[in-house]
Amino acid sequence: TDAACSAIGADPNLVTITIKEVAPDNYMRGRQQRTPASAPEQPEQIVHRYLKAMEARDLEAAAIFLSDMFEVICPGNKRFETLAEFTKWAQPRYRSISKTFLSTDVSFQGLDATVFCHGTLSGVWHDGTDFANIRFVDRFSLTAGLITLQQIWNDMPMAASGP
């Protein structure tokens, strides 16, 4: 509904979207019985699965969501082209970290998608003290269902240095 409303400038209460699924045994194209394709995984699902794998430090699982042209840009314009480089850089900063999502927003341009995640970080510093409620925003660019770019903004440097 939101995409249709933004395209035609209509109030959501005045727009009706209908989708009719075709039973697989009724699906034909080019005079041949075919199996319809399943819907692709949505960009926000890809991003959340990637971040869950990263939180678990399962780099192998996280890597399946990445394009060969992947790049991550961290605060201070630190740039990495592999998860191994990125995690090596991040390792001395904290013992563990997790994200609480307050919102996830998606926009599309053709087959490309941009996903913004925003929320708070919590975890444990290397000295064993807990941290929480540190703001973050991550921006992801996806092409053909793969992450090509992750940009990270957060308040961790301020939280690490104290009030």
Locate the predicted segments by residue.
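Short beta-strand edge/turn micro-motifs at domain boundaries
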Residues: R135-P163
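Hydrophobic pocket/interface hotspot
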Residues: A4, I17, Y50, A61-A63, ...
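Solvent-exposed beta-strand sheet faces enriched in polar/charged residues
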Residues: T18-K20, I73, W153
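A domain-level signal for the structural core that forms small-molecule/cofactor-binding pockets
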Residues: T1-A39
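Exposed beta-sheet edge and beta->alpha loop/turn motif
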Residues: T120-A144
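Short, low-complexity N-terminal intrinsically disordered segments enriched in polar/charged residues
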Residues: T35-D68, P163
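A short hydrophobic beta-strand element
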Residues: L111-L121
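A solvent-exposed, acidic/Ser-Thr-rich amphipathic alpha-helical stretch
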Residues: E60-L111
